[in-house]
């Protein structure tokens, strides 16, 4: 019992058991931790990304401020360098470089800004910029005066203005244009300031005269105007009369269409009452149309074909043969219809005789009922339709004769 094997076994058994339990618990804890990490991983990543974005935005704002400050300081540095080196532009040279047109407002404003930057003043302008400012002010005054003049012209009625006043206004406008051009040219030159002031005064004086002429004389309406107004007044009933005519024409057209529809309906009604008439009418129309077509084709061929032709064309032969066969088919169909009608009429005649005689004597019935009814029907049909057969034969002969004459 005191051997070393038993001692080791007694000591090692609980150690192994407790150790295995601890290892299993550690494995379970690790698995749970990994599972939680998988679940919470996206949220943590998103939170980290948001934090990074916020940090970048915070960093960008001071960078942008620094960049803007640097850009604002660059022109000042350049100006300081130009002043130190004596590279500043002379008066009016910037405006000449920008644009040759002295009336350009954009170039004038840019020249003013450049002059302000050069001088370092934001509120007051230098005397060199007085020239462009005067030019711009002159242009503004001229534009405002032209707008007011246009408004005054639009406010006045067109009839009150006469022809001499219109000619005066045109001449004055041309003078105004020349004055504006002279004012614009004078604004560019500082030496001719007095000339520009005089031209502006002249323009204002002419403009005031135009206003007085437009507002003051209010001429009464002439006889021509009254006559034109009297002519214009009765135009309304004339238009009404035209409208009435158009309405009456539309009503007449509608009535004609209704009458045509009624006529078609009556035709259909008569055909519905008498179906025999309907079939006959259709067949007669078909025959007439075909006869007319054949006649037209013959006349056209006779006109087109010269007398010295020896061999006619194949297309003409085919058309002639087709028309001939169509006519023959129509005649055959008409002949068959007439024969059927005659057979029906003969049968209706024989039936009462046979029914009446069968009661009295069987011999009469045998005699009246033949062994071959087909012969009887044929004979009756032949007897009843002698005239249609003759008419159809005569038509066939006529068509054949016309065909031979046309082919020859």
Swiss-Prot record:
It comes from the Eukaryota. Coiled coil: none annotated. It holds the Pfam family DUF4599. Residues 51-71, 297-316, 351-408 are annotated as: Disordered. Its main location: membrane. Residues 351-392 have a biased composition (Polar residues). This is Protein SPATA31F3. It is found in: Membrane. One of its GO terms (cellular component) is membrane. It is a single-pass membrane protein. InterPro entries: SPATA31F3-like (IPR027970). Keywords: Membrane, Phosphoprotein, Transmembrane, Transmembrane helix. Belongs to the SPATA31 family. The chain crosses the membrane at residues 11-31.
